[in-house]
Amino acid sequence: MNKITLLICALIVSISGLYAQAPTQASTQDSLLFEKNAHDYGTIVQGADGNCEFRFTNKGKSPLVLNNVHASCGCTIPEWPKEPIAPGKSSSIKVKYNTAIVGNFNKSITVNSNAVNNTVVLQIKGNVTPKQ
């Protein structure tokens, strides 16, 4: 009986040790804040300017690094700063949509960074009508 009690106590101590980890220091990590997370082109004509920009600010206390930015399809091309963004500074991700493709579109751009919110998904949408 004492062996079972000792075993149960050891198990409880082991499990509680797993949950006794030090809290993360989220306040000292970078925070990525976008002015907007979506852009609506509305209805545009085939071949029109498909460029838009997503401005963001590093709200953290250390340099922000955008590790990767990728679009949901090859018709959307993102450009992003490769150098670290200093605390309090702003920059932007430029997106070009291929407006040669006629029809409604709804695409996503996934931003991966070293921020607390390390994955942010941006959206673009619109409707491309044929040239007349």
Protein language model regions, located:
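Short strand-edge motifs at loop-to-beta-strand transitions and within beta-strands
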Residues: 39, 89-95
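Beta-strand-rich interaction surfaces with strong enrichment in secreted/lumenal proteins
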Residues: 42, 80-85, 96-97
